[in-house]
Amino acid sequence: PQSLGDCHLGGGSHVLACGDNVAADMLDWLYPERPVQESEGELRRFDQSEFAVKGLADTGYVFVPETCDAGGCPVTVALHGCQMNDEAIGDTFARYSGLNRWAEEHGQIILYPQTESSMANPQACWDWWGFAESTWQINPLHDTREGTQAKALMAMVERLQEAPDAPAEESTQEAD
């Protein structure tokens, strides 16, 4: 798109490398007091099926620095955009968003849950409009803490805070 100017490095318009480290800028703002503690880490696939709710894929990703293997690290949840799930772009968002590099330096786990496309949600978006519940509900819950996807995300975070290795299924190659 023209709005991107000359910034087309790194792929399509979903994940670009434009000389700015937006992930680090955002996380430094959110966590200004996090000390730097360099550590290697790995991007892992994990089985999301136990958190099964309408719209979630069977597999997600989690990035865990070595310093977080024993638990006790904060968790940041990174939700992909529409048409950015694993089925559409593979692990591109989880691998190249820039979040993993920051997480390695600051001892933070990054959770990349994944959605799936369906007839009700062909672009695999997160449920911001209510496709996962009855459209006839008087007080819809999809955009509250009581929504099915929000509850599943919180269950994933709680599991990771207990033991980051628990939901891990398999390791992928080292991530950026």
Predicted regions and their residues:
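Stable alpha-helical elements in mature extracytoplasmic
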Residues: 19-26, 95, 99, 149-153
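Short beta-strand element of the alpha/beta-hydrolase
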Residues: 62, 71-83
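Cap/lid segment of the alpha/beta-hydrolase catalytic domain
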Residues: 4, 85-89, 111-163
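N-terminal cap/lid segment of alpha/beta-hydrolase-fold proteins
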Residues: 16-24, 28-70, 142-145
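Loop/turn elements at helix/coil->beta-strand transitions in domains of secreted/extracellular proteins
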Residues: 71-75, 105-111
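Short amphipathic alpha-helix adjacent to the substrate-entry channel of hydrolases
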Residues: 90-108
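Catalytic histidine neighborhood in serine/cysteine hydrolases
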Residues: 1-8
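Surface-exposed acidic, glycine-flexible loop patches that form ligand/cofactor-binding
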Residues: 35-36, 64-71, 99-103, 162-167
